A protein has these predicted regions:
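N-terminal propeptides
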Residues: 1-186
């Protein structure tokens, strides 16, 4: 069950886009509250997502005036979703299962301060998914989400379906599982 009005609207969508994912992370996961509760990190090595949290970033041109612009800016600020090299966010672009897993991975790296989470599963042999080689750019994120019970492959086929869409209900279930993983109660 969604915890917010925005989550309720997204729950009924057949597929979610980058703007919807921004709203889910900001409203349902309460990313700002989560980040405020984390202890300050000392200097040293930072992942690309962590570097984004300390830099001042401008709002992407295609997010300005978008209905979800404040939520988009929030997930960009924390490095959960990124702006493309062209400076655009593409808020209406559909999110795939692989992209969702990548966003979850970035959050887990920032929340746990465990940089090894970004590379822990690359090169596994054999691949844990029948449809994804362990050399796939998002393999590590998919394996991390699967290992932690946040996202699962198909029980019958073993396929993760990285290019498949995520509907609103599944997106919210993933967020609830992620909240439980982080032991969050908001």
């Amino acid at each position: 069950m969604p915890g917010t009005e925005a989550g309720t609207k997204i729950a009924f969508q057949e597929q979610i886009n980058r703007a919807d994912l921004s709203v889910i992370f900001a409203e349902e996961l309460k990313i700002s509250e989560l980040m405020e509760k984390l202890p300050a990190q000392s200097g040293g090595f930072q992942t690309p997502g962590q570097m984004n949290t300390s830099s001042s970033s401008r709002s992407p041109s295609d997010a300005s005036g978008h209905w979800a612009s404040s939520w988009i800016n929030e997930v960009i600020q924390y490095g959960i979703l990124e702006v493309g090299p062209d400076g655009r966010f593409y808020p209406d672009e559909t999110i795939t299962r692989a992209e969702y897993a990548m966003a979850v991975q970035r959050l887990l790296v920032v929340a746990t301060r465990d940089n090894s989470l970004e590379v822990r599963y690359f090169g596994e042999s054999p691949s844990r998914f029948s449809d994804v080689p362990s050399s796939h750019p998002a393999y590590n994120a998919m394996a991390l989400c699967s290992e932690r019970g946040i996202m699962q492959s198909d029980v019958m086929t073993g396929k993760f379906n990285p290019t498949g869409n995520i509907d609103g209900a599944d997106a919210l279930l993933i967020i609830r599982t992620l909240q439980n993983s982080l032991r969050m109660t908001f």
